[in-house]
Amino acid sequence: MLHNNTAVPPLLEVSGISKQFSGVMVLKHIDFTLLPGQIHALLGGNGAGKSTLMKIIAGIEQPDKGILKISGHHVSHLNPTKAHQLGIYLIPQEPLLFPNLSVQENILFRLPKHQVDKSKMKQLLALLGCQLDLHVSASSLNVADQQLVEIMRGLMRNSKILILDEPTASLTPAETERLFTQLRELQQQGVGIIFISHKIPEIYQLAGQVSVMRDGSIALSGEIRDYTTDEIIQAITPVAKNQPLNGTQKLGLDLSNSPSQTASDRPILTVTKLSGEGFCNITFSVKPGEILGLAGVVGAGRTELAETLYGLRPAISGEIKLKQHSVNGLKTAQRLAQGLVYLPEDRQSSGLFLDSSLGWNICSLTHNRNTFWIRPAYDTAVLERYCQTLNIKFSHINQPIKTLSGGNQQKILIAKCLEAHPAVLIIDEPTRGVDVAARNDIYQLIRHIAQQQVAIIFISSDLDEVVRMADRVLVMHQGEINGELTKQQMDVDTIMHIAFGEHKPQQAASC
């Protein structure tokens, strides 16, 4: 590969880069190098500075200090247009598409005429295993398909430096492997790839080099084969880290509106022959205290089903019963008042008020429950409680949530759902964009909530996560439930086979 040629200068050379926001140092004298044909993994906890560093490289932010070189040439006053011209393309964690333009128009947007090659676009789609309709609007795509469109935009621009920020967060294992195949082909062509991920097994599978950021500095850097998983996790996690969560007592959760603490065999949520946009004839039930996994490939109908249960989409037919009473005729706010709470897949467009404060966001579902007036002091007290237990990093209490890192935004969204006192909690990709140090806390938190007899529907594209968390899993394929597995039956390989419709095992007895 090209990076074996020592005469070739680095594609990217960052020296002494520093950056601060509102007096807070977010980058401290960063050194980072990317060679041609190199896949360099970048890891770090939420708020470690990864996204800020990548925005500087992509020309979105300007450094306060330091030197940036592209292919051996010093570059200053970099902006996104100039970055694209230099072959730098950033694929963000949250897709930034034009919702009213078609998929094809988004891919080709602002592409120089000599690079507009529709046959190449179709070939790349085939290599990625994508079944995207190029003529539908981007607003109709789910998060995973939006991410694939962003990846296509970068590939169509013949980028020399490709930055991928959590590209597999909403992809299934099969889709992830197809992406990795394409990235390896780009690597052979001399493209340098910066790969940001919280999934350490992916890093060992794909990358040759690794750098770990912590508190705005580089804590570890070198060839990945020289480091163990434990060494990488230790570099990510500060030495003086918080103690593990100690049940809901430490959270101080008030689940008075939730079901009785006495375990019950009677389902709290029953769905019968439910059909809607993207799914049909869905029947299942979930009991208090049960974690019911919902797995399937992108486009299987999981998110559409969740949004229909919550009332965001209309049901075509079938019945939804919460606490033995039909909620078909209830609006979303009424279902919420009955204890049905939904944590959406796309936190920025559906879950959070980006210009509002952190405390206001956490309490936003309950502001009108007990009083007409908003109570800033109460919001602040709630914020402080969750920040201590979920290790949410922020500068000040009135800070807009849009200024937080992606992982910290996700933690605020989880806190918002918990503050609504759920009886049934539907969580769609709960650890998307959350670092390895925080995932275990979130897993533990979800289990503690289930132990208080809250029913949880757990939707995730990370099948290892589903196997780890779920008591039972329903596997969807093309809008239908293609299989059900008990805890003893489930493993990643079995779920994948069912998700792709290869076989349909005997249904479990309890449904």
From Swiss-Prot:
Catalysed reaction, written as an equation: ATP + H2O + (2R,4S)-2-methyl-2,3,3,4-tetrahydroxytetrahydrofuran-[AI-2-binding protein]Side 1 = ADP + phosphate + (2R,4S)-2-methyl-2,3,3,4-tetrahydroxytetrahydrofuranSide 2 + [AI-2-binding protein]Side 1
Chain ranges of the ABC transporter domain: 12-240, 263-503
Function, in words: Part of the ABC transporter complex LsrABCD involved in autoinducer 2 (AI-2) import. Responsible for energy coupling to the transport system.
PROSITE patterns (UniProt xref): ABC_TRANSPORTER_1, ABC_TRANSPORTER_2
Ligand binding (ATP): G44, G45, N46, G47, A48, G49, K50, S51
Keywords (A to Z) from UniProt: ATP-binding, Cell inner membrane, Cell membrane, Membrane, Nucleotide-binding, Repeat, Translocase, Transport
Gene name for this UniProt entry: lsrA
Listed InterPro entries: AAA+_ATPase (IPR003593), ABC_carbohydrate_import_ATPase (IPR050107), ABC_transporter-like_ATP-bd (IPR003439), ABC_transporter-like_CS (IPR017871), P-loop_NTPase (IPR027417)
Gene Ontology cellular-component annotations: plasma membrane
Organism of provenance: Photorhabdus luminescens
UniProt subunit comment: The complex is composed of two ATP-binding proteins (LsrA), two transmembrane proteins (LsrC and LsrD) and a solute-binding protein (LsrB).
Pfam families (UniProt xref): ABC_tran
Topology with respect to the bilayer: Peripheral membrane protein
Subcellular location: Cell inner membrane
Record-listed E.C. numbers: 7.6.2.13
Keyword presence, Transferase: no
Protein name: Autoinducer 2 import ATP-binding protein LsrA
Organism ancestry: Bacteria, Pseudomonadati, Pseudomonadota, Gammaproteobacteria, Enterobacterales
Alphabetized GO MF terms: ATP binding; ATP hydrolysis activity
Annotated family: Belongs to the ABC transporter superfamily. AI-2 autoinducer porter (TC 3.A.1.2.8) family.
